[in-house]
Protein backbone atom coordinates (compact mmCIF):
# COMPACT_ATOMS: atom_id res chain seq x y z
CA UNK A 1 0.00 0.00 0.00
CA UNK A 2 1.37 3.39 -1.01
CA UNK A 3 1.88 5.83 1.87
CA UNK A 4 2.90 9.44 1.27
CA UNK A 5 3.35 12.24 3.79
CA UNK A 6 3.40 15.97 3.03
CA UNK A 7 5.14 17.58 6.00
CA UNK A 8 6.92 20.64 7.34
CA UNK A 9 10.20 20.18 9.20
CA UNK A 10 8.97 22.60 11.89
CA UNK A 11 5.60 20.90 12.45
CA UNK A 12 5.28 18.83 15.65
CA UNK A 13 2.26 16.90 14.30
CA UNK A 14 4.24 16.03 11.18
CA UNK A 15 7.01 14.61 13.40
CA UNK A 16 4.41 12.61 15.35
CA UNK A 17 2.96 11.13 12.15
CA UNK A 18 6.39 10.21 10.82
CA UNK A 19 7.45 8.74 14.18
CA UNK A 20 4.27 6.63 14.25
CA UNK A 21 4.99 5.28 10.76
CA UNK A 22 8.64 4.62 11.64
CA UNK A 23 7.76 2.84 14.90
CA UNK A 24 5.36 0.58 12.99
CA UNK A 25 7.88 -0.14 10.21
CA UNK A 26 5.63 1.39 7.56
CA UNK A 27 7.45 2.36 4.36
CA UNK A 28 6.46 5.82 3.15
CA UNK A 29 7.54 8.67 0.94
CA UNK A 30 7.87 12.08 2.53
CA UNK A 31 7.70 15.45 0.86
CA UNK A 32 9.12 18.15 3.14
CA UNK A 33 7.34 21.16 1.74
CA UNK A 34 9.61 23.70 3.43
CA UNK A 35 12.62 22.02 1.81
CA UNK A 36 11.66 23.52 -1.55
CA UNK A 37 12.16 27.11 -2.71
CA UNK A 38 10.64 29.44 -5.27
CA UNK A 39 8.52 27.92 -8.01
CA UNK A 40 9.11 24.37 -6.76
CA UNK A 41 7.73 25.31 -3.35
CA UNK A 42 4.73 27.06 -4.93
CA UNK A 43 4.00 23.93 -6.99
CA UNK A 44 4.14 21.64 -3.94
CA UNK A 45 1.95 23.99 -1.88
CA UNK A 46 -0.57 24.08 -4.75
CA UNK A 47 -0.50 20.27 -4.85
CA UNK A 48 -1.37 20.15 -1.14
CA UNK A 49 -4.04 22.81 -1.58
CA UNK A 50 -5.62 20.86 -4.46
CA UNK A 51 -5.75 17.74 -2.27
CA UNK A 52 -7.06 19.33 0.91
CA UNK A 53 -8.59 22.68 0.01
CA UNK A 54 -6.11 24.32 2.38
CA UNK A 55 -2.57 24.11 3.66
CA UNK A 56 -2.76 22.15 6.90
CA UNK A 57 -0.03 19.65 7.77
CA UNK A 58 0.68 16.82 7.86
CA UNK A 59 -1.24 15.38 4.94
CA UNK A 60 -1.00 11.59 5.03
CA UNK A 61 -2.10 9.64 1.97
CA UNK A 62 -2.69 5.94 2.57
CA UNK A 63 -3.80 4.25 -0.62
CA UNK A 64 -6.79 6.28 -1.82
CA UNK A 65 -7.51 7.73 1.64
CA UNK A 66 -6.32 11.07 2.99
CA UNK A 67 -5.78 12.18 6.58
CA UNK A 68 -5.15 15.85 7.34
CA UNK A 69 -3.37 16.25 10.65
CA UNK A 70 -2.09 13.49 12.92
CA UNK A 71 -4.87 10.98 13.60
CA UNK A 72 -3.29 7.87 15.12
CA UNK A 73 -6.47 5.79 15.29
CA UNK A 74 -7.38 6.51 11.66
CA UNK A 75 -3.83 5.67 10.55
CA UNK A 76 -3.98 2.40 12.50
CA UNK A 77 -7.32 1.57 10.88
CA UNK A 78 -6.15 2.28 7.33
CA UNK A 79 -2.85 0.45 7.83
CA UNK A 80 -4.49 -2.53 9.60
CA UNK A 81 -2.27 -2.10 12.67
Spans of model-derived segments:
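Loop/helix-junction capping segments adjacent to catalytic residues or to phosphate/diphosphate-binding pockets
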Residues: 14, 38-39, 69
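Thioredoxin-like thiol-disulfide oxidoreductase module
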Residues: 33-54, 81
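A short, hydrophobic beta-strand/beta-hairpin element that forms part of a small beta-sheet core
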Residues: 58-67
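Thiol-/selenol-based redox modules, centered on thioredoxin-like
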Residues: 75-81
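A local structural micro-motif
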Residues: 29, 56-57
